[in-house]
Amino acid sequence: MEITELKREIQQIAARLGKTQDYLDLPALNANIQDLEQIAAQPDFWDNQETAQKTLQQLNDLKSSVEEYHQWMGQLEDLKAIAELLELEEDATLNEEAEANLTQLNHELDRWELQRLLSGIYDSKGAVLTINAGAGGTDAQDWAEMLLRMYTRWGEQQGYKVHLTEISEGDEAGIKSATLEIEGRYAYGYLKGEKGTHRLVRISPFNANGKRQTSFAGIEVMPALEEEDLKVEIPEKDLEITTTRSGGKGGQNVNKVETAVRVVHLPTGIAVRCTQERSQLQNKEKALALLKAKLLIIAQEQRAQAIAEIRGDMVEAAWGNQIRNYVFHPYQMVKDVRTNTETTDVNGVMDGKLDLFIESYLRSN
């Protein structure tokens, strides 16, 4: 990178950080931190543990924002120092270091700016993402498994913890359904736009004649809510609870004990299933928690079409309902039909590179 270009990039980052400082309002932020620290120092602070924990979480969030800003300012000063050295003497190693630091800092600022768009009541929560095979038979079940890998890879790349909480194997290949719990701040905010139908076009590996096949899978995304958030009372008469033997490959517990639990909320038809815990009781508790989260979100929306809008799998995973097309043949292209965002890097997308689509959706909304 030429020194003039480096200095121009540094000026642009300095301008971005100036806007960041204005947005944060550091004097007010520091005043809030002092107020919360005084509250936390009171002798009766832990008398109400729920309130105390929320206060500490708020305090930690504010401190993290301040520390993050100062860290970025430190990185900016380092870049300025490197630029001064490069003006005096060319150094390939220093130049590479400057480019790497610029890329990293720009990426962190992009991420921070994107998070400012996540202002929904549950956007900062973790996410529960469910995949259901739609129209397309065996190909659709294989497609559902490919999406399972894609979202798992995305979560891991973001530094989130990803847990598989339910899976139903396909008849010949792939999966009929699966549920991922993605732990981490803003996971729901980032993933909420993924709900809907995802369409795949490719040469079917399951067709002896090598014909092109179109397959569909439905994605549902819900926030992972804490116990204190789940203040939803569900009458027993509104629940239908069934148990089955855990499906899957291997394991001493598979197909021997009925540990899998399926819970249906009869008034709405919402169904959840959990298979991954070792006991029936644990699976029942997890399934009920997820059901409560879904009902709570629907109540928050207070719209007649709330279920259809919040639950991606309520729209039939079939032709005409897709939010995104993944074309492997006769050309390679992934295109979001809502934002017209597209890329030819099909392999990258299937390996979890979804930020292009996530960011364009958030900005469009």
From Swiss-Prot:
Methylated by PrmC. Methylation increases the termination efficiency of RF2. One of its GO terms (cellular component) is cytoplasm. InterPro entries: PCRF, Pep_chain_release_fac_I, Pep_chain_release_fac_I_sf, PrfB. Keywords: Cytoplasm, Methylation, Protein biosynthesis. Gene3D superfamilies: 3.30.160.20, 3.30.70.1660, Release factor (1.20.58.410). GO terms for molecular function: translation release factor activity, codon specific. It is found in: Cytoplasm. SUPFAM superfamilies: Release factor. The modification N5-methylglutamine is found at residue 252. Transmembrane segments: none annotated. NCBIfam families: prfB. Belongs to the prokaryotic/mitochondrial release factor family. Peptide chain release factor 2 directs the termination of translation in response to the peptide chain termination codons UGA and UAA. This is Peptide chain release factor 2.
